[in-house]
Amino acid sequence: MHKLLFSLLSVVSLSFLLFFHGAEARQREAPFPNACHFSQINSLAPAQATKFEAGQMEVWDHMSPELRCAGVTVARITLQPNSIFLPAFFSPPALAYVVQGEGVMGTIASGCPETFAEVEGSSGRGGGGDPGRRFEDMHQKLENFRRGDVFASLAGVSQWWYNRGDSDAVIVIVLDVTNRENQLDQVPRMFQLAGSRTQEEEQPLTWPSGNNAFSGFDPNIIAEAFKINIETAKQLQNQKDNRGNIIRANGPLHFVIPPPREWQQDGIANGIEETYCTAKIHENIDDPERSDHFSTRAGRISTLNSLNLPVLRLVRLNALRGYLYSGGMVLPQWTANAHTVLYVTGGQAKIQVVDDNGQSVFNEQVGQGQIIVIPQGFAVSKTAGETGFEWISFKTNDNAYINTLSGQTSYLRAVPVDVIKASYGVNEEEAKRIKFSQQETMLSMTPSSSS
């Protein structure tokens, strides 16, 4: 009796956990009314490029019908070698994907301790050891970044990026403007903590805005707050600086980056660091070994969600990385509980999207740098061109799931043959062929490529 009662309580508890997690994942502000009614979906390119001293920031038009439907906006940052994207934060949570390049990324979260310390004369990295040694620098945790990394960013958590490589670093950022953590409105905002407005003419979109947070304060207030003189306070305001938010560093920069997990052992227990402060905030999604679907002939797909990167529960977004070889195909499918923002990172593909009325709303060839929005429930297929196809998809749910129209795990495999016969007006042999012919689950080859 006790075992039965315990089992029932366990089932009820699990049901409540799943219900509340699902409800929490859906707590997004409603996008614009009727935003997802399309007669045609368009592929999107950047609407504006703001050039800085050592790079540029391109933004997509957040008022486009496609992005309004998804409730997101998109930016692309290009950093020249030895340049810094200066500290800034966004009003909504975001996911960033490193398209190319390598370097160092820092997050600045209020309440988190300075767990990285450099000590004068020390041969190692990090803090600890001899009390007679003098600290040269302390700062919050840093992360190395490289191609294929996905970074999660919470609302209001500042970040900076440094390109230490020999070529440009390119980072695509998707901001969830309808996330409940964004308490302002659905217009994207970037709050700069350093940097200044450039000399370029006024841009049509409202962001990136320009001056940093210090520039609006009375210099005397800044001087008192930091215990510095007025001249230094004016330096913080960047009053005579027009380099913008991406600047060139004066020589290679030095950082304290300890061995993995070392910084976690020296933290001060403050109740905050045990959540975001010590959370893993990035994962490389390009590694073939972590593929969820793999075909030696067609390609591979990797998924990053809150099950393998728990911080995504706070961001409420996830990512999917896909590669198709020449002639490879992603079987027709739909995302049941999220919109999809697909960014093309390489190659070409024919993409077709079908809406809730069974009408084709997109049927075009897409290439590098383009964005396509696939609304929740809309069916989509992808077929790679001769050079193959690469993409990164961002989905507006931290645990989004996909249903396929054909293949081993598709809805048709779960439907009895007699129901298929009645639904489509086919005989039993044709119904079985429809149900069982496709042996793949997600990735396949087109007939012309298979021959």
UniProtKB/Swiss-Prot annotation:
SMART domains: Cupin_1. Residues 42-234, 283-432 form the Cupin type-1 domain. The modification Phosphoserine is found at S39, S302, S437. It is found in: Protein storage vacuole. Disulfide bonds join C36-C69, C112-C277. Accumulates in seeds 8 days after anthesis. InterPro entries: 11S_seedstore_pln, Cupin_1, RmlC-like_jellyroll, RmlC_Cupin_sf, Seed_Storage-Functional. GO terms for cellular component: protein storage vacuole. Hexamer; each subunit is composed of an acidic and a basic chain derived from a single precursor and linked by a disulfide bond. This is 12S seed storage protein CRD. It comes from Arabidopsis thaliana.
